[in-house]
């Protein structure tokens, strides 16, 4: 689902220390 995808993106962003994803 879209929500699950967004959650995954946020996880990756946190672990990589990037803030390229913001909603």
UniProtKB/Swiss-Prot annotation:
Which catalytic reaction applies to this protein?
a 1,2-diacyl-sn-glycero-3-phosphocholine + H2O = a 1-acyl-sn-glycero-3-phosphocholine + a fatty acid + H(+)
Q: Does the keyword Iron apply?
A: no
Q: Would the keyword Transferase turn up in this protein's UniProt record?
A: no
The entry's keywords: Blood coagulation cascade inhibiting toxin, Calcium, Disulfide bond, Hemostasis impairing toxin, Hydrolase, Lipid degradation, Lipid metabolism, Metal-binding, Platelet aggregation inhibiting toxin, Secreted, Toxin
Where does it live in the cell?
A: Secreted
Name the organs or tissues of expression.
Expressed by the venom gland.
Task: Give the EC class as a word.
Answer: hydrolase
- Could you give a GO molecular-function term held by this entry? phospholipase A2 activity
Post-translational note: Contains 7 disulfide bonds.
> What's a BP term from Gene Ontology annotated to this protein?
lipid catabolic process
Which co-factor is required? Ca(2+)
Cofactor binding notes:
Binds 1 Ca(2+) ion.
Record EC number: 3.1.1.4
Which residue windows are coiled coil?
A: none
Any miscellaneous information on file? The subspecies C.h.atricaudatus mentioned in PubMed:20347857 is currently considered invalid. However, since different origins of specimens explain sequence variations, the specimen origins are indicated under strain in the reference section (in PubMed:20347857, South Carolina to C.h.atricaudatus).
Protein family (similarity comment): Belongs to the phospholipase A2 family. Group II subfamily. D49 sub-subfamily.
The protein's job, in short, is: Snake venom phospholipase A2 (PLA2) that shows high lipolytic (1048 umol/mg/min) and weak ADP-induced platelet aggregation activities. Also shows weak anticoagulant activity (IC(50) is less than 1.0 uM). PLA2 catalyzes the calcium-dependent hydrolysis of the 2-acyl groups in 3-sn-phosphoglycerides.
Entry protein name: Acidic phospholipase CHA-E6a
